[in-house]
Amino acid sequence: MNSISKDKGNIYILKAIAIFSVMCAHSTPLMDSNSKINVLSSQILDYLGTFGVPVFFCISGYLFAGNTRAWGDFWKRKMFTLFIPWICCETLLWLYVMLRKGGISIAAWLLFLLEYHHTTYYLTILVVFYVIYWKIRKPCVIWILNIVSMLSMVQTGWSTGIFYRFNTAVDSCYLNPFNWMLFFGIGLLIHRQKERESIRKLRDRQGILYR
């Protein structure tokens, strides 16, 4: 099995694990009951549901690091693979919600598309990362952003500090890019490390050939 096929296989496995985790996260509470088995099951599902989105961001960072398209070509492709499906699916879901609850307006539609208080906030943050990391290539800069991200997560958990205030400003810790930056950065760094290993192996082979 070549490295590309192995990469694809590993990514599919990670995606399956992440999907399972997201399903667990949205399966609680199991029922309106205080029985011990229900409480325990809900806690287990909560724990299993904590790593799905981080894994997806790691995968996205890894794949983004391998991008070779120019700025215009990249976003042209994303128009068809990301934005059009996103807008169509979210608009249909929004119409369903509005038919049940009312409150149709352009502002409500735009906020819904941007995942404001909505479960698919992942796409909004992903687009933000594509812009932020477009020119960032040096591992040292990525590490600095990872450290900033860890600080943001700590402050979010402790409900204090500038990043917690940022959460309050956007009215959701899920829409704070700094809370997710670490995982996207890890994906970038893994890809950078694989690139360095590939270059080293290639040089070793060339050295053997020319001895």
Please place each PLM-identified region on the residue numbering.
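Membrane-cytosol interface segments of multi-pass membrane proteins
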Residues: M1-W158, L202
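Aromatic-enriched alpha-helical transmembrane segments of multi-pass intramembrane proteins
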Residues: I136-R211
